[in-house]
A protein has these predicted regions:
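Non-catalytic C-terminal accessory modules of carbohydrate-active enzymes
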Residues: 134, 149-176, 198-199, 254, ...
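Solenoid-like repeat scaffolds
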Residues: 524, 555-563, 594-597
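Extracellular/oxidizing-compartment recognition motifs
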Residues: 1-345, 370-373, 390-396, 425, ...
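Repeat-solenoid scaffold signature
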Residues: 107-117, 121-136, 140, 560-592, ...
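Alpha-helical support elements that line or immediately flank enzyme active sites
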Residues: 231-238, 242-249, 289, 354-382, ...
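Well-ordered alpha-helical segments within folded domains of soluble proteins
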Residues: 351-363, 372-373, 404-416, 474-489, ...
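Active-site acid/base region of carbohydrate-active enzymes
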Residues: 45, 297-326, 330-333, 339-391, ...
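Carbohydrate-binding surfaces of carbohydrate-active enzymes
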Residues: 489-505, 570, 580
Length: 703
């Protein structure tokens, strides 16, 4: 779809001078209205009212995408990677909002990701452009059909109450100054990129929390929501003055929001009469907040993408239950504007490493099909058309990562999307891009190992290990290359493509030989001294011998906790479950050691930490990937090899020693799957409830 197909002959408009978050207004006359439809997009984010009534409850729309090419320097030279670009529009039925006589359409456009400068290197930041709006309002009254198109002759603008804005750190809203007269707008050229109707869930207020007042001192009130979420407090400003709200994920020793964990997030309101106050153009990631000034706290609105929870899990063992609950809370807090982010405050980016790692869990446990379909487009857009190089984030903003664990999103996410939902179209569309990414990895390989990324970029292997990194980066990056090559072979078979499979298999063999040559010790059976899960990466590829696996089990039985980063934690857990060490895998999941989920729970966390021991962000989903093993290897609800859309499953439950009951459910494309495990007279038992259309292969034992 192009501009005219979406917006007819409407023009993009922007203020003639710089404005932070402008209001746009258009007025028109209507007789007795019969119907009306509004086609609209406002970049960065917009909200609209017609005759003072909201057009929609959607928030932070349109979803974030790589809108157009940005011009900036990358390490002193023009950034020359070529991406795909697209923008999203929305269509609303406004029939019930039209009135006889004069009608007023008011649109508030905030910077969002379009007008927010983001870091591009050194001390540079770059935005796409300034806030802009385009709409076509088609309506029918007793006099016939009419169309109101945005343009300099129909739209005016003025400043809004938002006088300072930073997507990451917050807003200043000033209700004491006059907004000024309406001003002319200027027209902009239309986007030449693809236009799509937004088919991804918007953000919205999903629930409300009544926060608890902890204490008051010197006019400062400190509140606790009881959980780490995203959204905004709703305040009632009671008298003229300035109200300052500071947000944090933790409290300091002084009982105030901890500066180490407030990430610069602040809201300032200037008022001269009582009014309700909340964030408008951004969200805050926080558990605690302080309020200074004349205000009452009414509630806290929890805001994220309108994605339902489609799973249940119940365990008397506290850490297993905490892991499920914390993952859902963390993942939902990181679903905004159509992307799965790394954290909801500091960076807010769609990191491909974090996203590919937890995508299977996100698809299994949440009603997220449309959400991930949109993010797949972002992943596809943010590959360099010339070299096949994959970015560390989608949409692209400069940041850190690695070629393997981050770049493999181009293969892993469409493959898991197919497995979960049975839709092969994203794989079909992206398969040529997978091959181009493989070519990019070949260009950054030496001696059969992936050893570098583009100059000026990081080349991470695993990430956020406790202590000093000891697992070699090339081992990890080559692991992901081999895994992706194997997945591409499976994808080619699913799609009926024969041409490249021999080449891909030859590359697999070459890379496996390189891992043996560089890292395998035939005297011990270990790879890279079994450091930080190195053996598990290799066993997962089918490399090594019996000693390689046994040394994994010995190491983690002795440690009693993890020593791995985000990728190794997932792989170690799965390798132990799949290769005869279920009890040990369960012990790691329930461990309360220093590097464990139990440690996070015991320190009061309600979401997953970025680092095992805390520090920086307290809301990072990346360590949550093993949550899916609660369903696949404990409840035993696992898709059969080669199955998609849950048409065929293996029911292979496991009830760990010391745990007397587990239960849970998954809403699949075939219907709801339920499993229950319990002990009766000391014997473990299990039952499954599955729709008749699912072919269930049941294993005999429960433990």
């Amino acid at each position: 779809m192009n501009h005219s197909q979406m917006f007819l002959q409407a023009q993009w408009v922007t203020p003639a001078r710089e404005m932070t978050a402008p209001y746009f207004q258009a007025q028109f006359d209507c007789a007795s209205a019969l119907s009306g439809r509004l086609r609209i997009s406002g970049l960065g984010f917009f909200s609209a009212t017609l005759n003072g009534r909201p057009v929609s409850e959607d928030m932070f729309v349109p979803v974030w995408s790589d809108y157009e090419k940005r011009e900036f320097l990358f390490d002193g030279a023009p950034f020359d990677e070529e991406f795909g670009h697209r923008i999203y529009g929305l269509s609303y039925d406004v029939s019930a909002l039209l009135v006889p006589g004069q009608n007023t359409l008011l649109v508030h456009v905030t910077p969002g990701w379009y007008a927010q400068p983001t870091w591009v290197g050194g001390d540079q930041s770059a935005a796409y452009g300034r806030p802009r709006l385009c709409f076509a309002l088609e309506y029918e009254d007793e006099n016939g059909a009419h169309t109101l198109l945005s343009g300099p002759d129909t739209v005016v603008c003025r400043e809004s109450e938002i006088t300072a804005f930073d997507l990451f750190q917050g807003e200043t809203q000033d209700y004491t100054r006059p907004l000024g007269a309406w001003e002319r707008v200027r027209a902009l050229e239309p986007f030449a990129c693809e236009h799509l109707w937004q088919d991804c869930p918007a953000d919205g207020v999903e629930r409300r929390i009544a926060p608890r007042l902890l204490h008051q001192r010197d006019g400062l009130s400190v509140y606790d929501q009881g959980e780490n979420v995203t959204g905004t407090p709703v305040l009632l400003g009671t008298e003229p003055g300035t109200i300052t709200v500071i947000f944090s994920e933790a409290l300091g020793a002084d009982g105030l929001p901890d500066p180490e964990h407030h990430h610069g997030q602040k809201a300032i309101f200037h008022i001269r009469e009582p009014r309700t106050l909340r964030a408008i153009g951004t969200w805050y990631g926080y558990r605690y907040f302080s309020v200074q000034g004349p205000a009452q706290v009414l509630c806290c609105e929890v805001i994220h993408s309108k994605v339902p929870v489609t799973s249940t899990f119940h365990a008397p063992e506290p850490t297993l239950q905490w892991l499920y609950d914390a993952f859902l809370r963390t993942q939902l807090a990181n679903m905004h504007a159509g992307i799965p982010s790394d954290c909801p405050h500091l960076e807010r980016r769609g990191y491909t490493g974090d996203g590919q790692l937890v995508c299977e869990a996100g698809m299994m446990l949440l009603g997220s099909r449309d959400f991930y379909r949109k993010w797949l487009r972002d992943i596809a857009d943010c590959q360099d058309r010339k070299t096949g190089h994959m970015q560390y984030t989608a949409p692209y903003t400069r940041c850190g990562g690695g070629p393997g664990g981050w770049g493999c999103a181009i293969v892993q996410v469409p493959y898991q999307y197919y497995r979960q939902f049975g839709d092969a179209q994203p794989m079909r569309e992206m398969y040529p891009q997978m091959l181009r990414w493989f070519d990019s990895l070949e260009a950054h390989s030496e001696g059969g190992l992936v050893t570098s990324d583009k100059p000026g970029l990081w080349c991470l292997g695993d990430w956020c290990m406790p202590g000093k990194p000891r697992i070699p980066e090339p081992l990890v990056n080559t692991y992901f290359y081999i895994r992706s090559l194997r997945q591409a072979c499976a994808i080619a078979e699913i799609l009926g493509i024969d041409g490249e499979r021999d080449l891909l298999k030859a590359r697999i063999a070459e890379r496996e030989n390189a891992l043996y040559q560089h890292y395998y010790d035939p005297q011990t059976g270990d790879f890279a001294e079994n450091a930080q899960g190195a053996n598990a990466f290799m066993v997962d590829l089918g490399l090594g011998d019996a000693r390689t696996l046994e040394h994994i089990a010995q190491r983690y039985a002795a440690l009693g906790e993890y020593d791995t980063g985000i990728f190794g934690t997932d792989i170690v857990t799965r390798v132990l479950f799949e290769r005869g060490h279920k009890a040990l895998a369960a012990k790691l999941l329930t461990s309360c050691g220093a590097s464990s989920y139990g440690h996070m729970r015991l320190t009061g966390a309600t979401t997953l930490y970025e680092y095992w021991h805390g520090g920086r962000s307290y809301s990072h989903p990346m360590f949550g990937a093993p949550v899916r093993y609660l369903f696949q290897y404990l409840l035993g609800l696992r898709q059969a090899e080669g199955s998609c859309a849950w048409r065929e499953i293996v029911f292979d439950p496991y009830l760990p020693e010391g745990i007397n009951a587990l239960s849970g459910s998954l809403e699949t494309p075939q219907g709801v799957l339920r499993a229950r495990l319990w002990r009766e007279n000391g014997e473990a038992r299990a039952e499954i409830f599955a729709p008749a259309c699912i072919n269930v292969h049941r294993r005999d034992t429960v433990c």
